[in-house]
Structure formats: C-alpha cells, structure tokens
C-alpha cells in the first residue's frame, strides 16, 4: 500500500496519502430504483476516464452501453454541487442486486423494484462531482472517515508469513482478469 507500490506495513499515513480529504461515510436509505438508475447514468456518463467521478460498486451488478445517450448535468456556475439533469441518460441497461432482484432491465426501471441503501462519502452524497440525484436524498452519517474505513478493511485480510495483510488468491473480487463482474461495459 505504500505510494511506492512496494509491499510493507500498512500505516494510517499510507491511507491518508491515498485518501487525504475529510470525507465521512453516510448511508442514504430508501433509494428508489429510478434514483439508482439516474445515479448510475451519471457514473456511466463519465466512464472510467479518471477523476474519481466513476462510482465504485458493491452489492449489485450493472451493465452500461457506451452507445447510449450520456446523461448531461448542467453546471452554470461551475460549482460541482450546483448541477441539474438537462439530458436524460440511456446508457444503463441492467441493474441487478446480488440476490437476483432486478432494479433495471433492458434500460427500464422494473415495476415494484425494491428500494436500496447506498453508502458513500459525504462529498458524493451531497451532490459533489455533479451527482444531483444524491443531493436531494436523506442521509444518515456514520461519523467514520472513508480513510479509516479503508485502513480497517485492509487490516481485516488474513496475514501472510511476514505478518502483512494479504488478499487470498482465491478471492475473485480482486482478480486482474475477471473481477467479480460488478460492472460490465457494452459497446
């Protein structure tokens, strides 16, 4: 985890180097399938081009198509919190919870789809990076920084012979070739 990429002891300094902002974790409860789709449309509009705007997912599988229309969020003041959706996106094709329940199928929100809870940082939950859908929803704070959550998570892995946390090679979530399929891009 050191910024050099070399193996070694994981320190709070390492996680602060990676996540230097004072973001706290928050839960947003009762997020409708329609809101989930709009939030993911924003994520799919920026793709994986960097900048931190592409959301990291857990608990669901998402399929997006690059050929769909990207959501457009206006930002007349240049403030990343002031955006409004001006063009509806059509890139999100399917969203399925890991228990198999569908939220979005073939680009349409599924009738009677369950509401979900979203956990994210205060920056994103408050609409940062032009996520206006998140900004309008009710949040419950944990009081834990995302840096602390990362530190605790890394230390939760089994220790290797040198006493360092190590991801088991059998954990498909971290496979460089396949991953666990949380996100799929279609042409």
Map each language-model feature to its residues:
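Catalytic centers of hydrolytic enzymes
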Residues: 1-187
């Amino acid at each position: 985890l050191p910024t050099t990429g070399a193996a070694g002891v994981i320190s709070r300094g390492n996680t602060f180097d990676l996540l230097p902002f004072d973001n706290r974790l928050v839960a947003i409860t009762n997020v409708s399938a329609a809101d989930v789709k709009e939030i993911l449309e924003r994520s799919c509009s920026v793709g994986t081009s960097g900048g931190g705007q592409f959301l990291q997912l857990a608990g669901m599988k998402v399929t997006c198509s690059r050929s769909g229309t990207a959501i457009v969020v206006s930002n007349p003041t240049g403030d990343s919190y002031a955006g409004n959706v001006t063009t509806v996106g059509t890139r999100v094709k399917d969203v399925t919870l890991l228990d198999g329940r569908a939220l979005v199928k073939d680009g349409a929100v599924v009738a009677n789809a369950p509401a979900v809870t979203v956990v994210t940082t205060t920056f994103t939950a408050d609409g940062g990076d032009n996520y206006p859908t998140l900004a309008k929803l009710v949040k419950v704070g944990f009081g834990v920084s995302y840096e602390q959550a990362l530190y605790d998570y890394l230390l939760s892995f089994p220790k290797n012979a040198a006493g360092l946390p190590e991801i088991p090679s059998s954990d498909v979530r971290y496979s460089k070739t396949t991953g666990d399929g949380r996100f799929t891009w279609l042409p």
